Amino acid sequence: MKSRNLSILLASLLVIAGAVFATGAGAAGEVPPPPAIGATIEDFTLPDADNKAHSLKSLAGKNGTVLLFVSVQCPVSNAYNERMAKLAEDYKAKGIAVIGINSNVAEDTAAVKAHAAEHKLAFPILKDAGNKIADKLGATVTPEAYFLDTNNKLIYHGRIDNARNPAQLETSDLRNALDAALGGKTIDKAEAKAFGCSIKRA
């Protein structure tokens, strides 16, 4: 009898464990796929670290807009702080705006504001509470870039470049896409898989 009860208990535990792992897999699978290249991204509104609301339309550049999903704590995102700041500075004069989006549930607006000041991130960083925009765009990691043309069509999606360590930099995918668009050329590589820390969703 004891042996039978033990078998039933073990079987029950296996069923529960299976349900837990299945739930975990399902949660990961709930992130929608990103829009296809060429898709139009609808306008949205998010608050900045001072709780002032900004729409995509109000911040868009006259020659295009880059959306960068960023993080306060992610070491990969932090490895790109200087490069992101330089990117925003370099392309602002060329009519391309850079907008940061923080979708991590554990990083509040105070942390976002302090982090931006510490690392001299002069571009606006919006707080995506409930990760609604991250879900809308299928963003999964930080940093992750989306480049929109003047009609808000997605023309590049993915990594900023190939290397977390700038000493190993070989391909500046995002800059190449921006330069091609500014020159009226077709972007040769419109997608390059982003890498970094997973976005911690609500």
What kind of feature is each model-predicted range?
Residues 2-12:
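Bacterial N-terminal signal peptides that target proteins for export
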Residues 16-24:
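C-terminal segment of classical bacterial N-terminal signal peptides
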Residues 71-81, 105-106, 145, 197-200:
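Short, thiol/selenol-centered motifs that function as redox-active sites or metal-ligating centers
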Residues 42, 64, 121-124, 139-146:
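Structural micro-motif
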Residues 28-57:
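N-terminal "domain-start" segment that seeds a small globular fold
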Residues 78-119, 126-136:
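Structural microenvironment flanking redox-active thiols in thiol-disulfide oxidoreductases
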Residues 147-150, 154-202:
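Thiol-/selenol-based redox modules, centered on thioredoxin-like
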